[in-house]
Amino acid sequence: MQKSSMLKKEVAIARRQWYLVDATDLVLGRLSVKVADILRGKNKVDYTPNVDAGDYVVVINSDKVVLTGQKALRENWYNHSHYIGGLRTRSGEEMISKYSDELIRRSVKGMLPKNKLAKQILNKLFIYKNDKHPHEAQQPTILELKLK
């Protein structure tokens, strides 16, 4: 009889890798799915849902991400400060031009599980608007995504 083995947290931390993703001309949703899978560790053979076994992901050129269709014009993103009249509305064009890092972070966060691990998983995501990032010392593996 074959027994399944569960991944231990210490082993998962020791096996973590760094990946670099260039978001130039990639569709937001398709990029977010791949990034969320890597952050959770679903690309690994020993995936365990209750252990944070995912890798680190650095996303560069976030201001060059693409929204398909009319989403840049018609879709809005909302923030509320929890004060009266504190609702902020931002269009897709504004989110891409000014807050592209927050746009990708929100999209990936929505694809993560809604439990205690979500914050730990999201802390392994680093997003930069241009191609300069301070993670050269980690020697990230360049991940080529063919998503169009």
Swiss-Prot record:
It comes from the Bacteria. InterPro entries: Ribosomal_uL13, Ribosomal_uL13_bac-type, Ribosomal_uL13_sf. Keywords: Ribonucleoprotein, Ribosomal protein. One of its GO terms (cellular component) is cytosolic large ribosomal subunit. This protein is one of the early assembly proteins of the 50S ribosomal subunit, although it is not seen to bind rRNA by itself. It is important during the early stages of 50S assembly. Belongs to the universal ribosomal protein uL13 family. This is Large ribosomal subunit protein uL13. It comes from Ureaplasma parvum serovar 3 (strain ATCC 700970).
